[in-house]
A protein has these predicted regions:
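Short, solvent-exposed polar/charged micro-motifs at secondary-structure junctions
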Residues: 31-32, 118, 146-147
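A short, terminal or domain-edge coil/loop segment
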Residues: 74-81, 99-104, 127-134, 189-199
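Conserved thiamine diphosphate
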Residues: 86-140, 152, 164-168
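Thiamine diphosphate
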Residues: 1-100, 104, 140
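Conformationally flexible catalytic loops at phosphate/diphosphate-handling active centers
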Residues: 134-200
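Histidine (H) residue identity feature
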Residues: 41, 86, 100-103, 113, ...
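Short, solvent-exposed amphipathic alpha-helical segments in soluble enzyme
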Residues: 9-12, 60-63, 121-126, 151-154
């Protein structure tokens, strides 16, 4: 029940200077947004049920490497491929505990379209603030329902932009050097600094 997200983003993102890329599968989609995030862009992907299962290894990598991204999971009936048109809210524990290892993750659950709108903004803000993947969950009913939505005026919602390093070129860049505000700046791939990203 998530294709409508891709269809709308494919039409609307280019109008706003954004990019939409249709990948060949869920694993490639998750890995593509990790790479795009490392170049300094705000990124998201959307899936449902089994697709969310396929993304788990890459989500774990993004958690470990502290790469901000948003994953939308429009839940459907399961288990396995389940029933694409049947409502379910069965992926909440998977959002929290789905990947191997022990790490924190932020998961938000929406109960109507207004929640989805606001929580999408919140998800991006949280991802950028804490340099972590954020999962936004809602179910098939919300995914297919039509409902009135109040869109705030531009500038009415707080937007957190990525904190970029102020370390000049040719000076050692320490991406995890602590700061008083707790936020960690990032240097964009292809920018002034060369560094490796690993899940180790």
């Amino acid at each position: 029940p998530s294709p409508e997200i891709a269809e709308l983003l494919a039409a609307k993102l280019p109008e706003k200077g954004g990019k939409f890329i249709q990948m060949e599968d869920e694993i490639a989609s998750m890995c593509a947004i990790i790479g795009a995030s490392l170049t300094g862009h705000k990124v998201m992907t959307a899936t449902s049920g089994p697709g969310f299962s396929l993304k788990q290894e890459a989500i774990g990598y993004a958690c470990m490497a502290e790469i901000p991204c948003v994953i939308v999971n429009v839940q459907r009936g399961g288990p396995s491929t389940g029933i694409p048109t049947h409502v379910s809210q069965g992926d909440i524990n998977q959002a929290r505990w789905g990947t191997h290892g022990d790490h924190g993750i932020i998961a938000l659950t929406a109960s109507n379209h207004q929640d989805v709108f606001r929580m999408t903004v919140d998800a991006f803000n949280l991802a950028e603030t804490y340099r972590t993947p954020v999962v936004l969950l809602f179910d098939e009913v919300i995914g297919h329902m039509r409902e009135r939505l109040v869109v705030p005026e531009p500038g009415a919602l707080p937007i957190v932009d990525r904190l970029r390093t102020s370390v000049p070129k040719d000076v050692d860049y320490h991406p995890y050097l602590p700061r008083e505000d707790g936020r960690l700046p990032m240097s964009d791939f292809g920018g002034h600094h060369r560094y490796n990203v690993t899940g180790l």
